[in-house]
From Swiss-Prot:
The name this protein goes by in its record: Adenosylcobinamide-GDP ribazoletransferase
Pfam annotation, one family: CobS
BP-aspect Gene Ontology terms: cobalamin biosynthetic process
Gene Ontology CC annotations of this record: plasma membrane
Required co-factors: Mg(2+)
MF annotations from Gene Ontology: adenosylcobinamide-GDP ribazoletransferase activity; cobalamin 5'-phosphate synthase activity
Membrane spanning residue stretches: 31-51, 55-75, 109-129, 133-153, 188-208
Intracellular or extracellular location(s): Cell inner membrane
């Protein structure tokens, strides 16, 4: 179960202590547990959402979104911000784009992107709370993290060295595909035809975003993986809110 704890520590802000430095193989296997980590986060959000029943709707939605961000420690929002800055500032150049991604400073495009994504998430969460739906609290975190697994399964990692390289190099491909299939089946069983619609929308978004990465970078980075997660979570919320 060490790969699960590695995934939970890496993807979230929960106080997880590992017994020692994991091996590259254990890091690679941790990717298999990303959808399960999403299910853990979704379960925690479901419990928090239940506690807030009866609260004013806008406050309810704002608190759920805040808890959502805090669970991940803002890790993936940081990747989204870096990717937004790099995509605009890179002017189509691969090396310039990668260089901007490594810059810790956030430019105006990063700020605008974060505001828009969080605003849309808030609006979708508010609409879903008003409709008394709750399955979205599980679907969005699970699909977002399953997308990261899918990205590493089928996309080269373009930064040599570091954690991302170990994840990409030591990910078990066969079990990874089985985990993705099991995740898709679970989503359909959980949400029925709504789950099918969500999966179709997310598949289109996934392949479009992956194509952008391949054209610009020839692969993915940790930042673009985080951006993918955030945007697919948003796609889940918007799809369910509009159904």
């Amino acid at each position: 179960m060490l790969p699960f704890w590695i995934a939970l520590q890496f993807l979230g802000s929960l106080p997880i202590r590992l017994p020692g430095m994991p091996s590259p193989e254990e890091l690679g296997r941790s990717l298999l547990f990303y959808p399960l980590v999403g299910a853990v986060f979704g379960t925690l959000l479901l419990g928090f959402n239940t506690l807030l029943s009866g609260a004013p709707l806008m406050l309810h939605a704002a608190l759920v979104l805040t808890a959502w961000v805090l669970l991940s420690g803002g890790l993936h929002l940081d990747g989204l911000a870096d990717s937004a800055d790099a995509w605009l500032g890179g002017f189509g150049d691969r090396e310039r784009t990668l260089k901007i991604m490594k810059d810790p400073r956030s430019g105006p495009i990063a700020v605008v992107t974060l505001v828009l994504v969080l605003l849309l998430k808030f609006a979708a969460i508010l609409a879903l709370i008003e409709s008394h739906a709750s399955v979205w609290l599980l679907l969005a975190p699970v699909i977002g993290r399953a997308a990261m697994l899918g990205l590493f399964l089928g996309t080269p990692y373009v930064r040599s060295g570091g954690l991302g390289q170990a994840l990409a190099d030591h990910l078990p491909r066969g079990p990874g595909r089985k985990v993705l299939l099991a995740t898709a089946i679970a989503c359909v069983l959980l949400a029925g035809w709504s789950g099918v619609a969500v999966l179709l929308v997310c598949a289109v978004c996934f392949f479009w975003l992956r194509q952008l990465m391949m054209r610009r970078l020839g692969g993915c980075t940790g930042d673009t993986a985080g951006a993918l997660l955030e945007l697919l979570e948003l796609a889940v919320l918007l799809t369910l809110a509009l159904l």
